[in-house]
Amino acid sequence: MALPTLPSYWCSQQRLNQQLARQREQEARLRQQWEQNSRYFRMSDICSSKQAEWSSKTSYQRSMHAYQREKMKEEKRRSLEARREKLRQLMQEEQDLLARELEELRLSMNLQERRIREQHGKLKSAKEEQRKLIAEQLLYEHWKKNNPKLREMELDLHQKHVVNSWEMQKEEKKQQEATAEQENKRYENEYERARREALERMKAEEERRQLEDKLQAEALLQQMEELKLKEVEATKLKKEQENLLKQRWELERLEEERKQMEAFRQKAELGRFLRHQYNAQLSRRTQQIQEELEADRRILQALLEKEDESQRLHLARREQVMADVAWMKQAIEEQLQLERAREAELQMLLREEAKEMWEKREAEWARERSARDRLMSEVLTGRQQQIQEKIEQNRRAQEESLKHREQLIRNLEEVRELARREKEESEKLKSARKQELEAQVAERRLQAWEADQQEEEEEEEARRVEQLSDALLQQEAETMAEQGYRPKPYGHPKIAWN
């Protein structure tokens, strides 16, 4: 049996399909491997980032904060439980205490009720006893009032009492008059003593105030003298400041003159170089140097004169400055003599020698001028510094003087204000003491007048009572004499009193 023959294109198609399938499988495996690798790296990145985050300081702080929060919550919870337990115990203790108080109150109410009942019984019995005593007393008073013998005895006793009381009233009146007189004398003596003490106090206060016024006046005079001295000192300081400013301006003017002379010398020197006239130039240059030296000498002489006029420099610095200026003056005079000798010598030189001598002397002159300018600059700078220091010292002294004067003026104003207040207080005190004394005198007079009025009223009342008693007694005696004895009817049997 023969097998069917497969065409060739079918085999190639099958191989192509197999190759495509293998390629797809490989791509699927690669894609799967890529996804696994990417997932692995992604997970690794996530793990590393989480580990880095967890191991970082921020994560540590966050963890510690969370731990602290949990710990604080736990502590708050325990504290809350403890407070609740304590509150529960307090409420239980309070309930127990209230129960005990209620029990004690119930017992005390029973005891109080028993005591009230006992007190009620005692009060009732005491009231019955008191009622009996009052009834007996009333019966006794009724019998005493209606008994004629007792009434006669009472009338006799009353007459004797009136007579005796009249004598006693006379004695009491005399004693009261004597006592009132003694009181008046005592009041007068006390008033006189108080008046003398007040006068002595006022006199002592016046003497003390006069002494204080005298001391204050002396202090004011002293402060005013000091203020005048300070004003004179301020005027002196202002004048001194003006002089210092003038000296500084003079120094500036001298320095400006030196600068102008230097500029003029430079211009003249330039002209001489252009004309090449060495002999004439040497003569003129020598004359110019002499003029410069003369000018420097005049400046130093002026500085010496200013230093002699100065009164506020320290001694050591002043001597140093004087020595420097004197040395500079001596050096300039020596230089001036040397220049004069050179001028005489230059008259004998030839043209070529004069040229060489010109160059040589010009170098020497330049060195000497530089040294001289430096020394003059130092001297002028020192003088300017001294003047500036004087100006500063003068300014500070003026400020101190102004402050002191202002303080003195304030002190004077305070002293005047204090004196005014003390005077007002003294006047008020005098007025108050005067009013107090007048009030005491008026009060004592009023007391004496009230005592006299009361005594007169008492005497008048005593006389009126006595007259009324005598009239009633006489009227009662006449009535009894006219009517005779009449027994009184009694509505109840008499009680035999022992």
Curated annotation (Swiss-Prot):
Residues 11-39, 66-136, 163-353, 380-479 form a coiled coil. There is a cross-link at K50, K57 (Glycyl lysine isopeptide (Lys-Gly) (interchain with G-Cter in ubiquitin)). Residues 73-498 are annotated as: Interaction with keratin proteins. This is Trichoplein keratin filament-binding protein. Its main location: cytoplasm. Tumor suppressor which has the ability to inhibit cell growth and be pro-apoptotic during cell stress. Inhibits cell growth in bladder and prostate cancer cells by a down-regulation of HSPB1 by inhibiting its phosphorylation. May act as a 'capping' or 'branching' protein for keratin filaments in the cell periphery. May regulate K8/K18 filament and desmosome organization mainly at the apical or peripheral regions of simple epithelial cells. Is a negative regulator of ciliogenesis. GO terms for cellular component: apical cortex; centrosome; ciliary basal body; cilium; cytoplasm; cytosol; desmosome; keratin filament. Residues 167-189, 447-498 are annotated as: Disordered. Residues 259-425 are annotated as: Trichohyalin/plectin homology domain. Expressed at high levels in normal urothelial and breast epithelial cells. Also expressed in the smooth muscle and endothelial cells. Reduced expression seen in advanced bladder and breast carcinomas (at protein level). Ubiquitous. Expressed at highest levels in the heart, skeletal muscle, kidney, liver and testis. Ubiquitinated. Ubiquitination by the BCR(KCTD17) E3 ubiquitin ligase complex results in proteasomal degradation, and induces ciliogenesis. GO terms for biological process: apoptotic process; cell projection organization; negative regulation of cell growth; negative regulation of cilium assembly. Interacts specifically with keratin proteins including, KRT5, KRT6A, KRT8, KRT14, KRT16 and KRT18. Interacts with KCTD17. It is found in: Cytoplasm, Cytoskeleton; Cytoplasm; Cell membrane; Mitochondrion. It comes from Homo sapiens. Residues 168-189 have a biased composition (Basic and acidic residues). Belongs to the TCHP family. Keywords: Apoptosis, Cell junction, Cell membrane, Cilium biogenesis/degradation, Coiled coil, Cytoplasm, Cytoskeleton, Isopeptide bond, Membrane, Mitochondrion, Tumor suppressor, Ubl conjugation.
